Amino acid sequence: NRREDVWCERVYSPWHDLDKVMREQQIPLFALESQDPIKDFDFLGITIQFEMCYTNILQILDLSQIPLHAKDRTLDDPFVIGGGPCTYNPEPIAEFFDLFYIGEGETAYDELLDAYKEWKGSGKSRREFLERAAQIEGLYVPLFYDAAYNEDGTLKSFTPNNEYAPATVKKQIVMDVTDAPYPMKPVVPFIKVTQDRVVLEIQRGCIRG
């Protein structure tokens, strides 16, 4: 929120009890700060830390009343962006996302937001914005690529089908983390911690990533 023209809020995947109540009372998933429905935002960014969280992605989209598949979304829906460690292998969940940050998103935030502001008032299509986003280094737009697979499910080929999509999407790295933002007071769930363990972050990122 360092930009005066952008307001970023938080949202989390509800636990089973709240999920049940929200569905029964038809309450759409909403932001923590404003309580505005997620479906009314311009973007929905989802951090994907582990493969076991993939079902949470569908839960968030479903509770938000956002079409699950990117191809079914319209100008009335937010752009869904994936980020985090699992985006290094995005294909298993590619059809649910409009965009992926490959690597660290801080390097592309400003350019993407500026492109969105320019597009928003232009009257252009959703696809045209994605074409502009595909030109930003580090952004992967699944719509603009054709993936073919071997019989064992491994990736056989990966080919752009749009003139604006690069043949290779280069991961982005923040080389100097001295001034990189870090959440000092993260929201934590009021539930029993998995395996009764403590997670202590001693560095940014993964030494094998």
Where are the language model's segments positioned?
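A short beta-strand-loop structural module common to alpha/beta enzyme folds
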Residues: 4-17
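Glycine-rich beta-alpha loop elements in corrinoid/cobalamin-binding modules
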Residues: 14-162
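Conserved mixed alpha/beta core segments that line enzyme active sites in large multi-domain catalysts
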Residues: 53, 60-62, 69-73, 180-197, ...
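Conserved hydrophobic/aromatic pocket- or pore-lining residues that grip, position, or stack substrates
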Residues: 139, 180, 206
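N-terminal [4Fe-4S]-dependent radical SAM core
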Residues: 142, 148-199
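Local cysteine-cluster metal-coordination motifs and their immediate loop/turn environment
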Residues: 201-209
